[in-house]
Amino acid sequence: MSTLSDSVVPNVVVIDPRFESYKQLADSARLGRINLHIRSSGAEAIKLARRRTVDAWLIAADLDDMSGHDLVELLRSRAAEAKVAMVEANTPGSRLHAVAEQEAGAVGADAVLAHPITLRDLEELLGLPAEERTKVFAASGFAKAFVTLPVGVGAAAVSIAILLLG
């Protein structure tokens, strides 16, 4: 659990110009399971790293302004405690994926992930299994049912509470 920031919900930053590839992670963010930030360039990611504690970085190999490998090296020099994964298009188990894993390891990445990236992938990257996350939420006073409510239902409950309070 020492890999997570002070917030219970992990802060995850995706740096990839192809935003549409992260639908499953966006769904997890809407459920309150992760705080998801998406950027398309390395410069934007570095600015964010100055302002926010990040638990996991997911970095595509090709960015708008630099290579993903260069960004991994820059982030490692600034935020060594955060987990960093390279996102590759190659199928896990393929020869190209094995080469990508070697290259990513050489620049300091903790893992190589392939699409679709799921909440389970992030839990493995952070070293925090789902059962332990449930315990962390319960210990923090969050009801399990509250954490899994869709945003629409949560927003409706807040609206009703505001109307009742005046």
Predicted regions and their residues:
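Conserved active-site segment of CheY-like receiver
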Residues: 17, 87-94, 116
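Alpha-helical interaction/dimerization surfaces of two-component signaling modules
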Residues: 27-29, 48, 103
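Acidic, metal-coordinating helix/loop segments flanking the phosphotransfer/catalytic sites
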Residues: 38-56
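As written
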Residues: 54, 68, 99-112
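Conserved phosphotransfer microenvironments
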Residues: 55-77, 81, 89-90, 94-97
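CheY-like receiver
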Residues: 131-165
